[in-house]
């Protein structure tokens, strides 16, 4: 597991709150579980809780700087630069973690060949790769997460969603395509005060 980790300054925190993208069933939740496992091996006495938010931005806002906490963000997220540039945050670790299986799911038998598909923006390119023969994309609806995309199918708002096997199971959906994971790099941010090795500003810029 350590071979997939770059630990820059994760501390021996006794209680840690992990903030990331929800709801339950997202790849981010799975990545948070992987990070929890790493913490347990590195710091056996750590007690970890996971807090899921409907966006990475809301997850960041939910962090309480008075207690140890981290924000886990997929590097495929188009706006991840905002967290790297945030003066309140520091990058404390990165790790490689393959997502759960991704695929196209439906609620039942499809009555159309022209599909309205819900997806999070990040894995958009997978739609054409996974789309079964005989179907075409009529429109794409962006959701806040892959799990939210699955929920849109369950509510009958769209025909199909690009989502994870975990979210498909939660919402009782079935795959209509082949599936595959995504090899992903994840960034772990913490409030500056919990960074054990803060970045030093060069004297020439002070």
What is each PLM-predicted segment?
Residues 1-206:
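Domain-level signature for soluble enzymes in the chorismate/prephenate branch of the shikimate pathway
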């Amino acid at each position: 597991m350590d071979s997939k980790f770059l630990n820059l300054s994760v501390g021996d925190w006794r209680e840690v709150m992990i903030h990331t993208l929800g709801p339950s069933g997202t790849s981010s939740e799975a990545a948070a579980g992987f990070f929890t496992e790493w913490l347990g091996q590195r710091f056996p006495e750590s007690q970890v809780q996971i807090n899921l938010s409907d966006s990475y931005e809301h997850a960041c806002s939910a962090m309480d700087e008075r207690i140890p906490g981290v924000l886990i963000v997929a590097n495929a997220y188009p706006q991840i630069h905002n967290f790297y540039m945030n003066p309140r945050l520091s990058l404390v670790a990165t790790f490689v973690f393959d997502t759960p299986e991704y695929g196209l799911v439906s609620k039942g038998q499809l009555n159309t060949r022209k599909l309205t598909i819900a997806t999070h923006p990040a894995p958009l390119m997978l739609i054409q790769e996974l789309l079964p023969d005989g179907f075409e994309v009529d429109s794409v609806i962006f959701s806040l997460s892959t799990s939210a995309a699955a929920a849109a199918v369950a509510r009958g708002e769209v025909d199909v969603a690009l989502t994870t096997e975990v979210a498909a199971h939660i919402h009782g959906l079935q795959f209509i395509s082949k599936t595959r994971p995504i090899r992903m790099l994840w960034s772990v941010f913490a409030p500056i005060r919990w960074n054990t090795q803060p970045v030093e500003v060069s004297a020439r810029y002070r």
